[in-house]
Amino acid sequence: MSACKGENFTYSNFHCNLYIDNSTHHDPTLASAMNAMSPGVFCTIKYLPNRNAYFFTSNQGQSSTNNFDAKDTERGNSSRIGMNNGLIVGYANLSNDGSGYHFYAFDAQCPVCFDYNAIPMRSYPLSINGSGIATCANCKRQFNLNTGGNCINNTGQMTTYRATTAGPFGILFIN
């Protein structure tokens, strides 16, 4: 069954289609995670509905708020930030295969506890420490973002999305 292997089965079938142009936002928190020269820095992206703005926090202690511009509003980016208002992006520091570090985009909800189809939908956000370990407060699972989001104290795998970046102050696209 070699047809069932490969990268087609490592990504979520939920499509965010999030597009952020950091050349217009100039957000330093997001830029730090989009920099290939700083692997191990991850940025959580959230939407603040009361401000119509992005809220960025990094696992290195940075945080910033950046208002939507007209293009963000036009694209409907407020509804494209993960399954429940949260994405984590960054270069993994243990993924260098000789061609550079791998850029990842993860959903910010625990893949074990969160159910997109549950009524009512309950949030199980992951918290990230400075080493790039994401922890669920509910099930206590820990996921290593630097190795692709594998669970390090149980079973499971982070929900990942296809993502590209054009550098710190370029375009971030998460599919």
Question: What are the residue ranges of the model-derived segments?
Answer:
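Sec-dependent bacterial lipoprotein signal peptides
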Residues: 1-5
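N-terminal pre-ligand scaffold of iron-sulfur
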Residues: 9-125, 144, 160-175
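Disulfide-bonded cysteine motifs in exported proteins
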Residues: 105, 131-134, 145-146
